[in-house]
């Protein structure tokens, strides 16, 4: 909702007050009293009071949060006592509580429930936060205290988690410019501030491009092949937009089915081009210059800090350790999977030729369509056959029930917990002894103001302080097929897999059991964080799991054994193609961030060269991945996209133990909870994995699971 002029003026004055300007005190006190961020939340489990938070609350609360954080840091700096682990490292880890509270809500909602006003505020506040972060990481007196503890602390008196926190804290300074001279610190501030602005602009362009496009079709004949459920959803979208006929968007539940089922090749091509050119067209949403800026800024920062490349900087704190190990994994998988992937493409091409003629060339907009036709022919299976058994409410019960079966935890919806949109539900998570574990929010459907994709996030971290175990608040956000006027939300197999994936991340947060807030849950190496999520995907084709929830939404019939068998037989369909596709993204990522010199070339040409070894279909002029590759440009996966395959290596090896002992084996589940899910980054991930599995992971289990080796 747009602010009126008087409120906006008042907001600006109060924000200035928090950074030292002079103004009417009673006016600001009034703002404080009405701003929910300024007091403890009086909600169940102190959850965020979304129903009371307004756009005008963020800026003054954020500025006050910065002020409080600065005061807490100054108290650490000015402590007359000798620096110790408790008075410096622990104090620093707990500092900034109010600021964290505000920024967590603001940036999470900027992804899940944003507006033009909110995005403008994000552009305004991001540089302020970057400056504040730099003020801390470049503070010489603060770093001197941290370094004193790092250099002189008796590590024999520290627990493993405390030693890890000490190392992590020291690295957070050293890797963020604390050892630079004054002129280089000034340059570091300039570069990081510019990077925060640029990555935000990149992601906002992505959101605008996605939400601004709609393909409206008024001739039903052009939609031949589309299932009734897809047509109904498209008709509902058209109605919501005030249009006639059927409307398709670039959101996955709309885009995917048209590409998979629509017989009109030109319509498929039109939507494909819209999706794959959305941030490379000659308009205000073009991201090519932002790509260059982001790549060059990250390189400049890395080299300023003494690294040859951004990849060297990032991988220093990863399981992979260096670019050589990443490239070795990518090369191993490319060699192992490429022959099978080529065979899979050939088979789909042959399927297309049977209906289109010998001269037919398989293009990217044909892949999903003919791939689905071949799958249906080989296994008598398609998404529309299984959708009726995957009613969202039943899937939710099944996924939650899986956690109950494995870990003994239960989920109870609490409608008294405020939510930020009517689609969102909030649940209390209870441990097997009935004690409170966490709050989990679920947000399932696409809407304007919500970015595409699926993700898990935290609204509150877990930690232990003063004898109290403060439990986490986590959220899983998806973009599933929406219910229509005549049918409930019915999911595809892929959507159920996505649910399991994000729920695995949520369990990582829910079970957190560390002492310090920065050490628990998903606060782990990027190439370890996907293990808890990807291991959950392995349960999907298991008959024992499907039998717990896959009931027909109309008849109540349990999914037939014969259909389950087809799902199992089809689970490795085109698995090599999917692997090579992921490897192409990994190659592209490493190509951008292994650079040791700045880039000012053609983004499209560079991309084509980078992933050429993994290209299986023709490259289409006018399309580009990099300009919409939010993962590596603005989403935290720079020099890290390989993590998905690295974690897949881990999850295949880990789940082999479940397969060996039984998928519901309590001893294995308990070991996974105690050694992986609860530990966060309190110990090195290699140590944690070996303790759970008794061995290091290799690609062998993954290749065996995928049918690449027998």
Show where each model-derived region lies:
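C-terminal motif of bacterial Sec signal peptides marking the signal peptidase cleavage site
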Residues: 24-27
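C-terminal, non-catalytic "cap/extension" segments appended to globular domains
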Residues: 31-57, 64, 224, 245-247, ...
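Short His/Asp/Glu-rich catalytic/ion-coordination signatures at enzyme active sites or charged loops
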Residues: 42-57, 106-125, 147-190, 249-289, ...
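Hydrophobic helical h-region of N-terminal Sec-dependent signal peptides
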Residues: 14-20
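Active-site-proximal, well-structured secondary-structure segments within enzyme catalytic domains
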Residues: 161, 165, 197, 204, ...
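Bacterial N-terminal signal peptides that target proteins for export
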Residues: 3-14
């Amino acid at each position: 909702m747009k602010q009126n002029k008087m409120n906006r003026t008042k907001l600006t004055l109060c924000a200035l007050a928090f950074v030292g300007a002079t103004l009417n005190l009673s006016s600001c006190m009034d703002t404080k009293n009405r701003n929910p961020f300024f007091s403890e939340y009086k909600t169940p489990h102190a959850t965020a009071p979304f129903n009371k938070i307004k756009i005008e609350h963020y800026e003054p609360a954020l500025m006050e949060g910065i002020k409080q954080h600065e005061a807490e840091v100054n108290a650490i700096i000015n402590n007359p006592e000798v620096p110790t682990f408790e008075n410096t490292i622990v104090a620093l880890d707990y500092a900034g509580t109010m600021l964290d509270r505000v920024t967590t809500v603001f940036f999470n909602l900027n992804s899940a429930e944003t507006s033009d006003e909110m995005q403008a505020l994000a552009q305004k506040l991001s540089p302020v936060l970057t400056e504040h972060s730099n003020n801390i990481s470049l503070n010489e007196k603060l770093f001197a205290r941290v370094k004193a503890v790092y250099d002189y602390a008796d590590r024999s008196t520290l627990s493993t988690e405390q030693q890890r926190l000490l190392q992590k804290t020291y690295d957070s300074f050293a890797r963020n410019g604390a050892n630079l001279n004054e002129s280089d610190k000034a340059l570091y501030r300039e570069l990081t501030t510019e990077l925060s602005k640029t990555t935000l602009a990149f992601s906002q362009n992505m959101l605008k491009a996605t939400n601004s496009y709609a393909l409206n079709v008024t001739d039903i004949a052009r939609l031949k092949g589309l299932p009734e459920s897809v047509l109904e959803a498209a008709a509902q979208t058209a109605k919501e937009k005030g249009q006639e006929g059927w409307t398709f968007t670039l959101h996955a539940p709309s885009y995917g089915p048209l590409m998979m089922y629509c017989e009109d090749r030109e319509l498929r091509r039109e939507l494909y081009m819209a999706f794959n050119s959305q941030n490379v067209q000659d308009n205000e949403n073009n991201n090519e210059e932002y790509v260059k800026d982001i790549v060059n800024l990250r390189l400049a920062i890395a080299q300023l800090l003494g690294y040859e490349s951004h990849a060297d900087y990032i991988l220093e704190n990863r399981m992979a350790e260096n670019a050589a190990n990443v490239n070795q994994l990518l090369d191993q998988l490319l060699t192992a999977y490429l022959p099978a992937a080529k065979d899979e493409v050939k088979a789909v091409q042959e399927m297309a030729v049977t209906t289109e003629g010998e001269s037919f060339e398989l293009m990217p907009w044909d892949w999903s369509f003919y791939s689905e036709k071949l799958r249906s022919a080989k296994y008598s299976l398609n998404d529309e056959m299984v959708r009726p058994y995957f009613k969202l409410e039943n899937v939710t019960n099944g996924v939650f029930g899986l956690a109950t079966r494995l870990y003994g935890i239960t989920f109870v919806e609490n409608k008294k917990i405020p939510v930020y949109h009517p689609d969102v539900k909030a649940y209390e998570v209870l441990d097997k002894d009935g004690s409170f574990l966490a709050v989990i929010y679920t947000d399932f459907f696409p809407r304007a103001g919500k970015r595409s994709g699926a993700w898990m996030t935290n609204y509150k971290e877990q930690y232990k302080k003063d004898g109290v175990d403060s439990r986490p608040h986590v959220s899983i956000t998806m973009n599933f097929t929406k219910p229509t006027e005549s049918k409930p939300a019915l999911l595809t197999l892929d959507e159920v897999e996505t649910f399991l994936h994000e729920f695995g991340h949520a369990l990582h947060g829910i079970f957190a059991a560390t002492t310090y807030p920065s050490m628990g849950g998903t606060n782990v190496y990027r190439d370890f964080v996907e293990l808890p999520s990807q291991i959950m995907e392995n349960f999907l084709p298991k008959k024992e799991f499907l039998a717990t929830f896959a009931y027909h939404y109309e008849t109540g019939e349990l999914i037939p054994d014969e259909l389950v068998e087809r799902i199992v037989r089809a689970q490795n369909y085109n698995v090599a193609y999917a692997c090579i596709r992921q490897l192409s993204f990994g190659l592209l990522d490493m190509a951008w961030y292994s650079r040791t010199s700045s880039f000012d070339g053609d983004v499209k040409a560079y991309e084509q060269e980078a992933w050429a070894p993994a290209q299986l279909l023709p490259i289409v002029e006018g399309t580009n991945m990099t300009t919409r590759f939010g993962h590596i440009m603005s989403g935290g996966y720079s020099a890290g996209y390989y993590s998905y395959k690295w974690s897949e290596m881990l999850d295949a090896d880990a789940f082999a133990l479940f397969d060996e002992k039984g998928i519901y084996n309590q001893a294995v589940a308990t070991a996974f909870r105690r050694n992986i899910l609860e530990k966060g980054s309190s110990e090195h991930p290699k140590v944690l994995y070996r303790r759970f599995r008794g061995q290091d992971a290799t690609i062998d289990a993954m290749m065996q699971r995928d049918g690449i080796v027998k």
